[in-house]
Design a protein with these regions (language model features):
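Short, compact, well-ordered microdomains
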Residues: 56-91
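Compact soluble domain cores
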Residues: 2-61
Length: 91
């Protein structure tokens, strides 16, 4: 039985740099993890902030690492209108 995710992703976009580094199948896995509350490689404070944001309506930030060790962020806006995949230096 499918389970509804805790929040919508809205329009999903990715920067060219992120698309160059992350294979499509990995990107889909990360988006699923993000949408189901697995925030990846964030610290405990950011993890707790994301958990609070699910009810408070703040932005959500996940961080994942490529096989080469490059950090990639996934950010869903506070209003859940859009989710962006980007490198931290592009923020």
């Amino acid at each position: 039985m499918p389970v509804n995710p805790p929040f919508p992703l809205g329009q999903v976009v990715a920067t060219p740099a992120a698309l160059k580094l992350v294979p499509p199948e990995v990107l889909l896995q990360w988006l699923h993890r993000h949408q189901t509350g697995d925030w990846g490689a964030v610290g405990p404070q950011d993890w707790a902030a994301n958990d609070r944001a699910l009810t408070d309506g703040d932005r959500l930030l996940s961080s994942y690492l490529t096989d080469g060790g490059t950090k990639v962020w996934i950010i869903t806006e506070w209003d859940r209108s859009a989710t962006t995949v980007l490198l931290p230096e592009e923020y």
